[in-house]
Amino acid sequence: MRYRQGDKDALGELIQKYQSRLYTTLLKICQNPDDAMELCSDAFVKAVENIDNFKAESSFYTWLFRIAVNQALNFVKRKGLVSFSSAETAFANEDEPERVEFASQEASMPIDQLLEDERKQVLWRAVDSLELHHKTMILLRDIDQMSYNQIAEILEITQGTVKSRIYRAREALRLKLLPYFEGE
């Protein structure tokens, strides 16, 4: 890693490379732009302070992401914030919008778009009502499309635990959505 070797420009490159994606994820968790920016900055500071602890067993981004997500989850727990209800606004600046697009590409008629918008709202209300650990799994796996291995590294749990938590999170979400979609 160039920063470890004294290349001070490398830090700026890392921030430029990862800040937007990290900020977007943190915004999804804490739902406040100022808090997300502060958590993002804090994550970079903590990473720089602990750069000697980075073992390169995983990617730098995975290590940085673990720091940031842990800080965000602690922040949310401390503040008692568990709302994802305005999550769609967190996707407005998403670098890769195709990863979070729930609308059908065929929804070209205004009524079709209205129905798709309603489905999104129902989905986010259901996600909002999940317990924090379930929301985290939905966010990391289904929204950020991280691998089981990446999630395991970030949350410092086994892949088996990741898989079972994702299954339980999806099942909880399915049960919350079932009454709405039963007629379809």
Task: Map each language-model feature to its residues.
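N-terminal module of bacterial RNA polymerase sigma factors
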Residues: 1-21, 28, 108-112, 128, ...
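Helix-turn-helix DNA-binding module
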Residues: 121-161
